[in-house]
Amino acid sequence: YRKDSDTLIQFCNQNDVGIQTIKMIARGGWADNQKDCATWYDPYREQKEIDEALWWQLSQKIDTAPSCGEFSLLEKVLDAGSRFQQLSTEEQENITSTRVSIKPEPKLAII
């Protein structure tokens, strides 16, 4: 999945096509868990997790990332955005290597 995404991002960047990425704070699916948010995916809730998820996403070669779909987390997402720091490749790899999905969600390519 990552290789395909990187190829698509590169193609879009080379051809002046804007890229919008979504589901920035999705950590996995709900499976049989009780939903406590209005999203169809299970979102990160802690500020540190939201910071890392948003900063990782905005450190990619994209143009925009819409806000989250869960109102109760909006303040944390906006806070993370206001403090955005471009992550180095090493910092990005550290985030992706330490993230563990709570529940797989094929629609999010989290399996």
Q: What would you call each of these model-derived segments?
A:
Residues 1-111:
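Beta/alpha (TIM)-barrel catalytic core signal, keyed to glycine-rich beta->alpha loops juxtaposed to Asp/Glu
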